[in-house]
Amino acid sequence: MNQMWRTHLQSKVEQLKEQGQYRNLHVTEKAEETWLIRNEKRMLNLASNNYLGLAGDERLKEAAIACTRKYGTGATASRLVVGNYPLYEEVERSICDWKGTERALIVNSGYTANVGAISALACRHDMIFSDKLNHASIVDGIILSGAEHKRYRHNDLDHLEKMLQIASPEKRKLIVTDTVFSMDGDIAYLRGLVQLKEKYGAIIIVDEAHASGIYGIGGAGLSHVEKDIAQKIDIHMGTFSKALGCYGAYLTGDSIYIEYLQNMMRSLIFTTALPPGTLGAIRKAIEIVKEDNERRERLIENGAYFRTHLQEAGFDIGNSSTHIVPIVVGSNENTLRFSERLQEVGIAAIAIRPPTVPVGSSRVRFAVTSQHTIADLKWAIQHIIRIGKEEGFLV
């Protein structure tokens, strides 16, 4: 190996270790509905994004198997070559029915959706206004676009408006936000954002990755909690890999947006399409979430129970109001120790550190699901509080 490169890379790895930001891949040997096995230890899973417990649902498995038998294990090409199976158009129509939009486009992941769409829509002559805590895929899409990047303070619409006020009226403007923030569990003020986009002649993209399948009528997303808001969103992005228990993502909105992205989005054009079996599972998952209000209600109730008890115990959970509940610890070292101690007693909860979150705000991120029982959560809360006290995070 080239010695110059070896020295450089080894130095960077050692630096990560010293800063408490080194990451390892740990094998999950078996994952049940709410429990998993890691390092031969059975743990309550409070770390996954399987919010509605659908990843192991037999109906999705059977749908995937049926489509795999019919079409094969791989799409064999890009959608724009010969990889566009009939399932794509069928599922895209169901997304439009679900979201009340004109046209939809399925892509391979939430990351490629955001990077591809933002970098295709905007260029160096444009301005993009992005919440400071937006997902990395949004940030990377903005960087790739070359557009002027304006980051407004988290959920601070006054700050955003000041930026919009001084922006050149000659420039195209794009506002982009997560709807549920993945590391904080709080939500965007969509009505205010829509009002600002209309007032200043912008368009808006919302990332519903952690809200699709959960909020709004039929689980259509947080933007669908109030119908008039959904109709004013220009482009909705959502994923199938979280509440829907599958893989992949979608972009949907007015036809002209989707037509443009289909022709200009490099992360669609230059990649092999999703396997047919995945599309079969997606189709079934959408059917289920549109009808299964009980799972959504149970998830929301579980989130409220978990949040309330941790907050009452004295933990810093920020402004979480959803099923994602962080305990903000601060330093990397203390956060890693907290996570390790939780895993020792059988709770899978992972330390989240920079660059995923801002420096000084490292945390253990908990994610409850609809399938957790109150007994599960009560047991976990007792251990979390005990360890928190022993480690000095609680008085």
Swiss-Prot record:
Annotated residues that bind pyridoxal 5'-phosphate are located at: G110, Y111, S182, D207, E208, A209, H210, T239, F240, S241, K242
Cofactor(s) recorded for this entry are:
pyridoxal 5'-phosphate
Give the pathway listed in the UniProt entry for this protein.
Cofactor biosynthesis; biotin biosynthesis
Catalysed reactions listed for this entry: 6-carboxyhexanoyl-[ACP] + L-alanine + H(+) = (8S)-8-amino-7-oxononanoate + holo-[ACP] + CO2
A single GO molecular-function term is: 8-amino-7-oxononanoate synthase activity
> Among its keywords, does the record have Transferase?
yes
Annotated substrate binding lies at R23, H135, T356
Q: What is its EC number?
A: 2.3.1.47
An annotated GO BP? biotin biosynthetic process
Q: Which UniProt keywords apply?
A: Biotin biosynthesis, Pyridoxal phosphate, Transferase
**Sites of the modification N6-(pyridoxal phosphate)lysine?**
K242
Q: What is annotated about its quaternary structure and interactions?
A: Homodimer.
Family, per entry = Belongs to the class-II pyridoxal-phosphate-dependent aminotransferase family. BioF subfamily.
Q: Which PANTHER family match?
A: 8-AMINO-7-OXONONANOATE SYNTHASE (PTHR13693:SF100), CLASS II AMINOTRANSFERASE/8-AMINO-7-OXONONANOATE SYNTHASE (PTHR13693)
Give a short account of what the protein does: Catalyzes the decarboxylative condensation of pimeloyl-[acyl-carrier protein] and L-alanine to produce 8-amino-7-oxononanoate (AON), [acyl-carrier protein], and carbon dioxide.
Protein name, as recorded: Putative 8-amino-7-oxononanoate synthase
Upper taxonomic lineage: Bacteria, Bacillati, Bacillota, Bacilli, Bacillales
Gene that this sequence comes from: bioF
